[in-house]
């Protein structure tokens, strides 16, 4: 089954009886070509194509399907020579012209209109064409596929080697599994000294049936865990201290605000001036009596001592007087009232002051 796709050109049949798949794109170029002429030519090409298709169907025993798409859109622009000419470009996928020959054809087509018909790849082309070598692309595609296959084999080898390296690295980085006895012994050793010198490391590795590097890595991890735990404890302590200080600061700010409010507000009490206490006369006498008694007591204590000396001095100085007779003394004594006892003095009235 053969498929023919035609856009503006007729389908051609090769000498071997096979159907050529021709992709033709007819674009009318020219300012003076009218749309009616383009449509008339399209109808003629359709009639010619239908006739050739019927002849091919009668000659070929195999069924075939034909798809014809005729473009009725004409884009016109003036050429370099100033005249209008119709140019149709076709792609012949069954022929194998060289790409190098097609490129000069394009250059000649641009340079002058006379060289274009000579390089036309199809008898139905009127303006010029450029062939496309798909067979070369196919060969090149096969070569690239082969190269990719070879490169894929090399890439597969490289990927396999990389996978083996990754497996080795993973086995080397595999986590160390220790028994309970080994873990307990390492913990006791870590409590005694957290760092090991080379001799201690080798001795501990021999004792636990491990490599020195494994012992060193275990101690490094243990120190890291210890440091991390200590850091967490310190962070918690600092967090609590910060919370306590925050509460204290809030409380102090509150007290300061209250004191400032009391200072700026008007006071509710009045300052009373200092007063003098008055005393009644009786209280003054009572208060003054102890003072006079205390001042007179030393004077009384000193006066008896001085009295004998004065009496002795007067006794020595004055001679003893002549005593009269008792009879003369009796009549010479003056008469007076009889002696009576002294009346006591009434006490002063009590005062009413407190």
Swiss-Prot record:
Residues 229-273 are annotated as: Leucine-zipper. Belongs to the HD-ZIP homeobox family. Class II subfamily. It comes from Oryza sativa subsp. indica. Residues 171-230 bind DNA. Its main location: nucleus. Keywords: DNA-binding, Homeobox, Nucleus, Transcription, Transcription regulation. PROSITE patterns: HOMEOBOX_1, HOMEOBOX_2. The keyword Cell inner membrane does not apply. This is Homeobox-leucine zipper protein HOX27. Residues 148-157 have a biased composition (Gly residues). Residues 98-175, 294-323 are annotated as: Disordered. InterPro entries: HD (IPR001356), HD-ZIP_Homeobox_LZ_Class_II (IPR050762), Homeobox_CS (IPR017970), Homeodomain-like_sf (IPR009057), Leu_zip_homeo (IPR003106). GO terms for molecular function: DNA-binding transcription factor activity, RNA polymerase II-specific; sequence-specific DNA binding. The keyword Cytoplasm does not apply. Probable transcription factor. Coiled coil: none annotated. The gene is HOX27. Pfam families: HALZ, Homeodomain. GO terms for cellular component: nucleus. Expressed in seedlings, roots, stems, leaf sheaths and blades and panicles. It is found in: Nucleus.
């Amino acid at each position: 089954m053969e498929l023919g796709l035609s856009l503006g050109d007729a389908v051609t049949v090769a000498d071997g009886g096979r159907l050529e798949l021709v992709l033709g794109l007819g674009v009318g170029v020219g300012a003076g070509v009218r749309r009616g002429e383009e449509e008339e030519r399209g109808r003629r090409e359709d009639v010619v194509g239908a006739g050739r298709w019927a002849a091919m169907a009668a000659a070929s025993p195999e069924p075939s399907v034909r798809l014809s798409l005729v473009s009725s859109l004409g884009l016109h622009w003036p050429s370099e020579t100033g005249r209008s000419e119709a140019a149709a470009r076709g792609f012949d996928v069954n022929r194998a012209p060289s790409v190098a020959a097609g490129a000069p054809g394009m250059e000649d087509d641009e340079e002058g209109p006379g060289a274009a018909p000579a390089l036309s790849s199809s008898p139905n082309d009127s303006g010029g064409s450029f062939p496309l070598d798909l067979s070369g692309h196919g060969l090149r595609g096969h070569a690239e596929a082969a190269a990719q296959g070879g490169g894929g084999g090399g890439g597969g080898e490289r990927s396999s080697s990389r996978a083996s390296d990754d497996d080795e690295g993973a086995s080397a980085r595999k986590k160390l599994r220790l028994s309970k006895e080994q873990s307990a012994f390492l913990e006791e050793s870590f409590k005694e000294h957290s760092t090991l010198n080379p001799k201690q490391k080798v001795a501990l590795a021999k004792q636990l049936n491990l490599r020195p590097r494994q012992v060193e890595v275990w101690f490094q991890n243990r120190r890291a865990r210890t440091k991390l735990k200590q850091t967490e404890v310190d962070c918690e302590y600092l967090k609590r201290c910060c919370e306590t200080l925050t509460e204290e600061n809030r409380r102090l700010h509150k007290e300061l605000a209250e004191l400032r409010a009391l200072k700026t507000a008007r006071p509710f009490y009045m300052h009373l001036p200092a007063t003098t206490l008055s005393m009644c006369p009786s209280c003054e006498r009572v208060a003054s009596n102890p003072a006079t008694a205390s001042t007179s007591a030393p004077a009384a204590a000193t006066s008896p001592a001085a009295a004998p000396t004065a009496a002795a001095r007067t006794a020595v100085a004055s001679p003893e007087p002549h005593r009269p007779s008792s009879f003369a003394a009796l009549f010479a004594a003056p008469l007076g009232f009889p002696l009576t006892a002294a009346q006591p003095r009434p006490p002063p009235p009590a005062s009413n002051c407190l």
